[in-house]
A protein has these predicted regions:
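Short, charged, surface-exposed hinge/linker loops at domain edges
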Residues: 1-4, 36-69
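A short, exposed loop/beta-hairpin motif centered on an aromatic-Gly-Thr core
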Residues: 22-31
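Flexible, active-site-adjacent loop/turn segments at secondary-structure boundaries
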Residues: 20-23, 44
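Short aromatic-glycine-(Arg/Gly/Cys) micro-motifs in beta-strand/loop hairpins
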Residues: 5-21
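Intrinsically disordered, low-complexity regions of eukaryotic proteins
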Residues: 13, 23, 65-67
């Protein structure tokens, strides 16, 4: 078992979840549903395309100018 990262973004009425280590993406109506769907998608992907996963993710923030909210 590996612990992977889920990055979530709210888009309109859905949550979009991404796994940066594998590249899988899924969505759900709630954070919990999006993560559960991402887990399933990632497991299915890795069953079809097995590979060694190096977990070396680094997340940071950055500022941008002239963004209209």
């Amino acid at each position: 078992m590996k612990t992977l990262t889920a990055s979530l973004i709210k888009e309109e009425d859905m949550w979009v979840a991404k796994c940066p280590e594998v590249g899988t993406v899924s969505q759900g109506a709630s954070v919990e549903e999006a993560v559960a769907n991402l887990r399933e998608a990632t497991e299915l992907y890795l069953e079809e395309f097995p590979r060694k996963i190096n977990i070396r993710s680094i997340f940071t923030t950055f500022d941008v100018e002239n963004v209209k909210a």
